[in-house]
Each structure stands twice: as structure tokens, then as C-alpha cells.
């Protein structure tokens, strides 16, 4: 039998190829106690971009480990569903800078309606607003004054 560390390594290697036949393994792995396994499986589900995984990715976006949350946000970006957009917007308020940045870039890359971005920019969370502003500046090559 293969231990969880090795499974995670293998999943990380094959995930970009989008093999749907491993979907069940990925789904089950998102509930693992092993952080590396959760990260690998959430990323793998993101590569599959199956709307059926929306709930799983939204749940992973609230994981205790920031790397899992960040991977979930990138997966939600690929879904682009209304719930995924809302999940990405919520992640701009994450306590971890890296997750806020991933969410900000994901929100912009999702080609959402400008009102979705304005919601974050005009919201009460300064850090969320700053993350989106920074991502906007970077995505259109504007210079900050």
C-alpha cells in the first residue's frame, strides 16, 4: 500500500493532465488529515474544473491551512459559477495575505462583472480592497503612486 505522502506526490504529478478517472480519489483526499494530500487533491479538482465539485472547493476554501485555501480559490476561479465568484470574493478577506492575493488575482482573471470587483473595493475590509487594487494595478501594468 502507498502511504499518503506518496499518494500526494503522485497526485501532484498527474493532476495537470486532468485525468477524470481519478476524480473519486481526489474527492476523498480533500478530507484527509494529511495536509499535503488535501493540497494535492484540491489542486487536482481545480484542474478538472467540474461544477459538481463546487461545494467541495468552497469547503476547502475554509480549510485551516492557507495553502489548501489558496488552491481551492484557484479551482473556484476555473468554475466561474455564481457561488464560486462569491467564494472568491469572500477569500479576499482571508486572514492570510497569500490567500487574499490569490483571490484578488482569481477574481480579476474570472472576467466577472465590474460590480463584483466594486463590491470588494468598496467593502469594509481594507485588506481585501488593497489586495484587489494591487492585482488590478499588476494586471494592467499601472504604476502605483
Residue map of PLM features:
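Amphipathic alpha-helical scaffolding segments comprising HEAT/armadillo-like alpha-solenoid repeats
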Residues: 1, 18-31, 50-62, 81-93, ...
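Alpha-helix N-cap/helix-start positions at coil->helix boundaries
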Residues: 4-5, 35-36, 51, 66-67, ...
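Conserved hydrophobic register position within alpha-solenoid helical repeats
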Residues: 10, 41, 72, 103, ...
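Alpha-solenoid helical repeat scaffolds
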Residues: 1-16, 22, 27, 34-35, ...
Amino acid at each position: 500500500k502507498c502511504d499518503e505522502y506518496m499518494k500526494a506526490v503522485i497526485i501532484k504529478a498527474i493532476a495537470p493532465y486532468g485525468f477524470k478517472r481519478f476524480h473519486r480519489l481526489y474527492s476523498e483526499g480533500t478530507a484527509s488529515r494529511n495536509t499535503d494530500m488535501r493540497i494535492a487533491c484540491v489542486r487536482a479538482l481545480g484542474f478538472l474544473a467540474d461544477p459538481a465539485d463546487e461545494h467541495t472547493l468552497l469547503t476547502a476554501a475554509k480549510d485551516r491551512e492557507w495553502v489548501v485555501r489558496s488552491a481551492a480559490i484557484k479551482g473556484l476561479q476555473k468554475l466561474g459559477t455564481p457561488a464560486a465568484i462569491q467564494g472568491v470574493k469572500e477569500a479576499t478577506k482571508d486572514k492570510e495575505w497569500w490567500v487574499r492575493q490569490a483571490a484578488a488575482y482569481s477574481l480579476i482573471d474570472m472576467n466577472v462583472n465590474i460590480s463584483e470587483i466594486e463590491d470588494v473595493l468598496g467593502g469594509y475590509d481594507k485588506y481585501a480592497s488593497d489586495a484587489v487594487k494591487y492585482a488590478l494595478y499588476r494586471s494592467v501594468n499601472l504604476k502605483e503612486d
